[in-house]
């Protein structure tokens, strides 16, 4: 329950058909209860169950700090169907991140990852992510040892689905996500939190595309567009910074949730 008996906000439903539903997960919410976050009060599974009056089954996860599209099932059979698409890598996921520094226009990262809680001798698992630069920003403000603050907006297209894959791959590229307390740098995280008045991980699950669960031969595209102030007010604040867009359609793709060609 939320503190002092306050009601939780309604979770925005992005799509609902048959026994499948997709919602916008706000940053700071856990997908489900866990013993590692005993003091937390905001859980998507329990809140959505109470909101729509039926049990829900998550078929993938987003980190607590990540906002955006979260797909769930309303029955065990639908959960198995959706999970099979993820296992066969038929789900195309698209994320937006604000990172430290100015990365290359494109990057293909094929860097195996060992699970965070695995012993050192455990084998690393294959992990592949494509990155595309969307925009750059430079502010004449010294942070840490740098005379300027440079950040970029990147599109992340994960091919595999390892835990914390995008965050760890961006760290591998030496461009960690702003607000990432584990893989980023505290001085930059603190400066941006104070500058924007928002303390969060700047990672957003912008869209999912997958074979339509109810219509053979069709594809389903679900987006949580950054153009929606109701869903993504903090990102709208970020986008007021002086960004230099890397491609003609980069801003439109970011705002509307349009999917780039792979």
Predicted regions and their residues:
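Short beta-strand segments enriched for Tyr within beta-sheet-rich domains
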Residues: 162-170
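N-terminal accessory regions of nucleic-acid-interacting proteins
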Residues: 76-122
